[in-house]
A protein has these predicted regions:
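Basic, helix-initiating cap at the start of DNA-binding domains
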Residues: 1-33, 37-46, 63-66
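Short hydrophobic/aromatic patch on the recognition helix
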Residues: 47-58
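Hydrophobic alpha-helical connector segments
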Residues: 67, 81-112, 164-171
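Hydrophobic alpha-helical segments that form the core
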Residues: 112, 117, 160-181, 197-200
Length: 221
């Protein structure tokens, strides 16, 4: 029984390693070429794996695409959201969240910049499970930014009449514009412009308490 269990555990771990290897490659491909650039055969060839083995792990191109989206969401959360899990609500935290996003894009965690910006343009006018998964990831991020603004407002860092949905829309637009310009033209200045615009937007709606937090963040940086 113990030998059988050890053998099974070994196979499971090898399967998990192969899955991580495949998804690492598919995330990079999709960020540059789109999710339609993925296929079981291509991945098997590029990674020198058996096509039957890749098929056993994913079963179809659509499942490979969906798994890639889920993996990318985990990478995004690890780089952008997780570093702030212990940070108190406030204007300083909102700006740090935006800075994390700009760093995630500018440091090319994915080869094509922001994974979700790239695949959203590919699937925004389509229907089906892949479109729905992309839309859900985008919605979750927007909702998270809105909630961060709302929590900062409740903490007294922003004016009581702050429109959190509008504020989130504006800072996300600046971040995505920086990503698009940098990826297209291969330059980094767009990220500096985006950060200046975001900071100006936050300061325009910040209370004295919020301004103090933003100023303290500048000194810490």
């Amino acid at each position: 029984m113990s030998d059988t269990g050890t053998t099974t555990d070994g196979r499971v771990e090898r399967g998990n390693q192969t899955r991580r290897l495949v998804l690492g490659r598919t995330m990079d491909i999709a960020s540059v070429e789109g999710l339609d650039g993925l296929s079981l055969g291509r991945i098997a060839t590029e990674l020198r794996l058996s096509k039957s083995g890749v098929f056993a792990l994913f079963g179809s191109k659509e499942e490979l695409q969906l798994s890639t989206i889920r993996a990318a969401a985990a990478v995004f959360a690890e780089n952008v959201v997780a570093p702030l899990k212990d940070a108190p609500p406030g204007a300083r935290r909102v700006r740090a969240l935006c800075r994390n996003w700009l760093t995630y894009s500018s440091e090319r965690v994915f080869s094509g910049g922001c994974f979700f910006y790239a695949v959203s343009a590919e699937f925004d006018a389509r229907t089906g499970p892949v479109h729905d998964a992309v839309a859900r990831a985008r919605h979750d991020w927007t909702e998270y930014v809105e909630r961060s603004f709302a929590e900062a407002r409740a903490a007294g860092d922003f004016d009581a009449d702050l429109d959190v949905e509008q504020s989130a829309f504006e800072v996300i637009a600046l971040m995505e514009a920086a990503n698009a310009q940098s990826v297209l033209f291969g330059e980094m200045r767009a990220y500096e412009r985006a950060e200046r615009g975001i900071t100006a937007r936050l300061r325009a709606s910040a209370t004295d308490r919020g301004l103090a937090g933003l100023d303290a963040g500048d000194e810490a940086a």
